[in-house]
Amino acid sequence: MNKHPWKNQLSEMVQPSGGPAEDQDMLGEESSLGKPAMLHLPSEQGTPETLQRCLEENQELRDAIRQSNQMLRERCEELLHFQVSQREEKEFLMCKFQEARKLVERLSLEKLDLRSQREQALKELEQLKKCQQQMAEDKASVKAQVTSLLGELQESQSRLEAATKDRQALEGRIRAVSEQVRQLESEREVLQQQHSVQVDQLRMQNQSVEAALRMERQAASEEKRKLAQLQAAYHQLFQDYDSHIKSSKGMQLEDLRQQLQQAEEALVAKQELIDKLKEEAEQHKIVMETVPVLKAQADIYKADFQAERHAREKLVEKKEYLQEQLEQLQREFNKLKVGCHESARIEDMRKRHVETPQPPLLPAPAHHSFHLALSNQRRSPPEEPPDFCCPKCQYQAPDMDTLQIHVMECIE
């Protein structure tokens, strides 16, 4: 039970004696251990001195034992403290050992993880090399497409210049018609002397001319509206081009192709409108040669022609502005042509490295916005159709030529 039996023995050794009897016992024990035999010799004269000396020796022995006992206690406490410190150090070393074991296990797991990451990186490097080869092939095909698009762009510019020349010729004819209107003013006095039937006929023909003017105005307004829609579609195309220039080179080329096709269609529509205006100008010329008009009506007609000429000059300015925008777009396209290859390749590489790959951007939004602009242009609110109605019998004619024939027959 007791871990230190020697400690109990020491405590028994340091118990103080109770009295002279005990001293005598101790003296007997000391004599048995080898003390001189003269202490036990009975002597009446030497007994008090001997007893006093024994007591002093006993006291000295007690002091020595007490000091020895105190030293032993201090030594025992030091040993206990040392044992406690050794136990704490052992626990600390065990804790450090457990931490070191956990650290070794964690480092082993990290080593396995790094090894798997290294293998994954090698696989990705192989994929990147394959992608680089594919990008080189795509670069050659894109260069060929850009060359073909530049040729188409030059062809469309030549067509635009031809349309501008035709428009200038048409304006010259309009000025000639205005000169004829001034000549008709001098004939106004003679025309006022004619028969009342001729006056009615002139009024009917005047109404037909006004209807033709309304048609021409509507055609001009339609042309302005189409030009505004074309300009809006052009701005929309430019925005789509600017937003998708970094995502896909093929989409840019497709947008430019659609834009060139739209410009060609617009030029064809302009050419048809110019031909129609030429025919109407010829009809007006015939009408002005055969049917005189009142001065007020001639002034109105002249003012309308001047307004139309002013409007056409504005249209010319707008077309020149669009031509400048087209040239600026071509210059920007040439500047961005080289940078787009690198940006597209970097973007594709970045998309392949993300954890959740995003679907590639398709050129559908640009085409959709372009076709939406065209559909909005085609589905614009319809204008009010011209009223080809006979003022005498209220006959509703389908077109201006039919109305003129009917009016002549109705008057006769």
From Swiss-Prot:
Residues 250-339 are annotated as: Linear polyubiquitin-binding, does not bind to 'Lys-63'-linked polyubiquitin. There is a cross-link at residues 111, 139, 143, 226, 246, 270, 276, 278, 285, 295, 302, 314, 318-319, 392 (Glycyl lysine isopeptide (Lys-Gly) (interchain with G-Cter in ubiquitin)). Residues 150-250 are annotated as: Interaction with TANK. Changing residue 301 to A: Abolishes linear polyubiquitin-binding, impairs 'Lys-63'-linked polyubiquitin-binding and impairs NF-kappa-B activation. GO terms for biological process: anoikis; B cell homeostasis; canonical NF-kappaB signal transduction; defense response to bacterium; DNA damage response; establishment of vesicle localization; negative regulation of endoplasmic reticulum stress-induced intrinsic apoptotic signaling pathway; positive regulation of canonical NF-kappaB signal transduction. Changing residue 375 to A: Decreases phosphorylation and increases NF-kappa-B activity. Residues 246-358 are annotated as: Self-association. GO terms for cellular component: cytoplasm; IkappaB kinase complex; mitotic spindle; nucleus; spindle pole; ubiquitin ligase complex. Changing residue 312 to A: Abolishes linear polyubiquitin-binding, no effect on 'Lys-63'-linked polyubiquitin-binding and impairs NF-kappa-B activation. Residues 1-197 are annotated as: Required for interaction with and ubiquitination by MARCHF2. Gene3D superfamilies: L1 transposable element, trimerization domain, Nemo cc2-lz domain - 1d5 darpin complex. GO terms for molecular function: identical protein binding; K63-linked polyubiquitin modification-dependent protein binding; linear polyubiquitin binding; protein domain specific binding; protein heterodimerization activity; protein homodimerization activity; signaling adaptor activity; transferrin receptor binding. Residues 315-336 are annotated as: Leucine-zipper. This is NF-kappa-B essential modulator. It comes from Mus musculus. The lineage of its organism: Eukaryota, Metazoa, Chordata, Craniata, Vertebrata.
